[in-house]
């Protein structure tokens, strides 16, 4: 009897652990159907070397982070001459002279000495068929980002935080980099105190990507706008990309939130932009942006001029009826508080949504409260 009781307790404990590390929900939008590591037995890395190995091997894996993996000082530091194109005040970011960027593009900027952590400059390689998931709020990668490139596909990143990547130094590293990938779901991820981009999709095709329920925290001691508001938020620049952004909290930024160009179809739905010191969207040539059901609170300029791509900003109930033809439903109005205008209504590109997996949309009325409380590594 006692043996049976102990076995039952052990079984219950194992079941509880399994439940705690399983993926929550499923991807909406363009990355619908992504499975990551699927039913692979979960592994719990204990060291940064084990984490790098698990993420970079060729096995389907479910990788559970149950603590902070701190890469700071793991690859040494570099001291060299950089530049200060935004000024030398204590709150200003300065730039590493990566690929002679200072020399070629900022020749008149003051030269400054920079000392940065080498680990941050290039993210951890993540190969195909991986689920990377945090256990509660414990899963943190500090001082180094994630890098998915060169054909990687079928990846889920959920309920983790990526923090403290050379925050003083532009070109010091990105939190999440995608370039030439397909079927990637970034969900309930917090990014904070990042050198450059919180999320960047490079110039090669990134195909089907969903970014959901994530917290882009732009609050920092250093910024390119020298005001504590991070400029380098989200950059979508792929040559054939379909990106769903849903339920994200984009906070305390000053630009590129997101910057969209290349050949990118973006569906931005039920996101909450809050407390921006300048502008949110930059919509360049080759951008096709549908924005609906979002909330913009204290965003002085919602979209920077000029808008060179195409934008349907869901400006009115009558205008939004056109969405029924292409999305199978009307689009939701956006909500604004102490923010600039956002009313462009290009419609020719909406046909690009036909036959695609489209995220659902709720009214903006409940977005601010629900997103602010649930976005990021809160599972």
Curated annotation (Swiss-Prot):
Signal peptide range: 1-20
Annotated S-S bridges: 83-102, 92-226, 323-331
UniProt enzyme class: lyase
GO biological process terms on file: cell wall organization; pectin catabolic process
Keyword Lyase: yes
Pfam families associated with the record: Pectate_lyase_4 (PF00544)
Keywords annotated in UniProt: Carbohydrate metabolism, Cell wall biogenesis/degradation, Disulfide bond, Lyase, Polysaccharide degradation, Secreted, Signal
One GO molecular-function entry: pectate lyase activity
Protein's cellular compartments: Secreted
pH dependence: Optimum pH is 7.0.
Catalysed conversion reaction: Eliminative cleavage of (1->4)-alpha-D-galacturonan methyl ester to give oligosaccharides with 4-deoxy-6-O-methyl-alpha-D-galact-4-enuronosyl groups at their non-reducing ends
Cellular component GO terms held in the UniProt record: extracellular region
Gene3D superfamilies: Single-stranded right-handed beta-helix, Pectin lyase-like
EC number: 4.2.2.10
Active site as annotated: 256
Task performed by this protein: Pectinolytic enzymes consist of four classes of enzymes: pectin lyase, polygalacturonase, pectin methylesterase and rhamnogalacturonase. Among pectinolytic enzymes, pectin lyase is the most important in depolymerization of pectin, since it cleaves internal glycosidic bonds of highly methylated pectins.
Family per record: Belongs to the polysaccharide lyase 1 family.
Protein name as catalogued: Pectin lyase A
Species annotation: Emericella nidulans (strain FGSC A4 / ATCC 38163 / CBS 112.46 / NRRL 194 / M139) (Aspergillus nidulans)
Upper taxonomic lineage: Eukaryota, Fungi, Dikarya, Ascomycota, Pezizomycotina
């Amino acid at each position: 009897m006692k043996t049976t009781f102990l076995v039952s307790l052990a079984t219950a404990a194992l079941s509880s652990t399994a439940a705690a590390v399983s993926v929550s929900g499923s991807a909406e939008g363009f990355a619908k159907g992504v499975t990551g590591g699927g039913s692979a037995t979960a592994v719990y890395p204990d060291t940064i070397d084990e984490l790098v190995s698990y993420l970079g091997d060729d096995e389907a894996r479910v990788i559970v982070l149950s603590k902070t993996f701190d890469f700071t000082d793991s690859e040494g530091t570099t001291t060299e001459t950089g530049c200060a194109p935004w000024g030398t005040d204590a709150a200003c970011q300065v730039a590493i002279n990566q690929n002679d960027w200072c020399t070629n593009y900022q020749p008149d900027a003051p030269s400054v000495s920079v000392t940065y952590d080498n680990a941050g400059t290039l993210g951890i390689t993540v190969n195909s068929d991986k689920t990377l998931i945090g256990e509660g709020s414990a899963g943190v990668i500090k001082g180094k980002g994630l890098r998915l490139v060169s054909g990687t596909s079928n990846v889920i990143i959920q309920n983790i935080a990526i923090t403290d990547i050379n925050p003083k130094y532009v070109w010091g590293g990105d939190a999440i980099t995608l370039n030439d990938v397909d079927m990637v779901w970034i969900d309930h991820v917090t990014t904070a105190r990042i050198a450059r981009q919180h999320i960047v999709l490079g110039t090669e095709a990134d195909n089907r990507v969903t970014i959901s329920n994530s917290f882009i925290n732009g609050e920092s001691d250093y910024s390119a706008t020298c005001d504590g508001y991070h400029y380098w938020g989200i950059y979508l620049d792929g040559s054939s990309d379909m990106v769903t952004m849903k339920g994200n909290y984009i906070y305390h930024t000053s630009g590129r939130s997101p910057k969209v160009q290349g050949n990118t179809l973006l569906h931005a739905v039920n996101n909450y932009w809050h407390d921006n010191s300048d502008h949110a969207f930059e919509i360049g040539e080759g951008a096709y942006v549908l924005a609906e059901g979002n909330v913009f609170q204290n965003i002085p300029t919602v979209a920077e001029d000029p808008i060179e791509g195409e934008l349907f900003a869901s400006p009115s109930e009558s205008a939004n009826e056109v969405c029924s033809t292409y999305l199978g439903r009307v689009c939701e109005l956006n909500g604004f508080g102490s923010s600039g205008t956002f009313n462009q209504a290009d419609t020719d590109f909406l046909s690009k949504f036909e036959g695609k997996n489209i995220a659902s949309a709720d009214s903006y009325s409940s977005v601010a409260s629900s997103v602010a409380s649930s976005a990021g590594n809160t599972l």
